[in-house]
């Protein structure tokens, strides 16, 4: 989980803009209820470990915004105010197979601080926030990467195009021109992320109206766009493969700057498919929560006023409580509302990447109410836990493989066609269970095999020393039915059939 440290002075300055007095003791005592863990607090600041699902808490500005609502009952709207801008960015159609999702925004008149120390601290905080988003939402820049630029150094409109690896420009922290290939071979960021462009003859660059490269996503910015102590107007670009991750990343950077007084302006993007997009979209997302689901999970009826107050603490809004007029006559799923059933219409911020399902709204309401306030009733029926029939076999398999020096891992059951079949050069031998409305391109199906997940893990760690030996015993879904499978994979310099046979024989002997 990402760990961040925020200075007391930074938090105090941000809260004072809204007439709130900062209380470090209150933060240390209650902030953990919101979705993070206070690791340490000293005279200089507070160190916080943020849960993986709360990517909206990774900057001091967004954390202060969340704390305003949660700790101080200061209502924060679930929308981000975005004014209509005039700057455009044209995206070449060739980017569809290189890096198809391209978004941008302008933020002007940001208050970066009153002293050089405050402005330097702001720049460092902005860069840290950017890298934390790369790590979490961006999956190490694979799904989304962010570029932040000094707008005063740019000449709009902008163009995104594909260039060959001989194309030259001066990258960040360098004083001379380098070719794309030289950057990938020798620049620190180039060598770290070159694998994201592996096998591509052409790579993406963003240029301004006079042909200067301001960004080479997902690797490095141009040197002339560097953010300095004098920068108050910003241009943000976000590129990647996952539209939802890119949108959330863009909104969170804009939100951080808006919390410092910045005015967010939209950009007109002529996308890879020829459609015109106006981004960012600061409007809240609307969700439907069946009252039946809320009552069943929380154990009783929750009044609308309590729901409204709880959602406001979490940065959301209860729009209305009404009777459902459409949907199935009778629903077999808790999350679906039937005709005639009472539902709650809820707005949550579009940058809340973790709100995927109505059950997430139940969690938001429970957190806003406070788990200590939900009651302490116990079940009148006492039951004893009994191991499942397969539990002993699974334990023996894991123990056998672990005793052979193979590390046990646990990967996600959700996967996609590329990992499960295309990269493995396999064809599906069973019916594939697909997600009806996938939130991300990474998770579109339920896995049929475990081995592709292990291969993906080894591929991600190919830069680390060998040997690497991993195994997993877990569930797969074939022909829409769950089943248990075991797989192991070893990356070794001298690996061969004899080693694989030895592992199989040892496992058979132990069973």
What are the residue ranges of the model-derived segments?
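Extended beta-strand-rich architecture
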Residues: 2-6, 25-27, 33-36, 41-44, ...
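Function-determining surface determinants
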Residues: 47-49
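N-terminal structured subdomain of primase-like DNA metabolism proteins
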Residues: 15-21
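Generic N-terminal amphipathic, Lys/Arg-enriched alpha-helix
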Residues: 4-15
